[in-house]
Amino acid sequence: MELTIDILIEEAKAFSQMLSAQNHSSLIGVTDGKAVGTYVEHLFQNHLSRKYTMTVGSSASGIDLPSVNTDIKTTSYVQPQSSCPFKSARQKIFGLGYNLLVFVYNKQDTKTTCTLHITHCTFIEADRTADYTITAALRQMLSVHANKDDIIGLLYDRNVPGDEITYSDLADEILANPPQQGYLTISNALQWRVQYKRVIELNNSVGGVVNFVW
């Protein structure tokens, strides 16, 4: 059976509950969030590949599940954030270009057990993966008929990566194709720094974002 988005979301929910019930003894004492994330993501990919026809990503494809255009992110409840590859400044406004599946865990260790309690599992459609504050500001400006110079001014004010040509091209695209409201917090760095606190707490109130909470 071919893996689809609907199946992915249901499997992510079931996997979260299964993962929370297991003893992950190999992670006892591990504090490196990247190691925990890799562990969870590989388990989930294996869980899916046993049941469905799918493509597993590589460093070349850049995302974990290219056949459903989805990247998997695993992050601690203490500070739900991760990094995403920077491709262009327009990702901050129009989205990353792929869906995100986010597992948020609370890790608890004893001498003999490690529990990964999945507190939140959130699926975010690609067009909701832009930055919250800049898309809100742009949508507000467009609602009162802002012009190209107004938009370029906002891009400067918000320190969007790029030069005058980038800003001019972005402003033209924003006027021609107003962005959807995004729900991530995206900070500029060599890679995008993405924070998930807002999106994991939407409680299924926004189209394009599916939330499970335990």
Language model features: what each stretch is:
Residues 70:
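Acidic/His-rich structured neighborhood in mature extracellular/periplasmic domains
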Residues 1-66, 74-214:
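Nucleic-acid endonuclease domains
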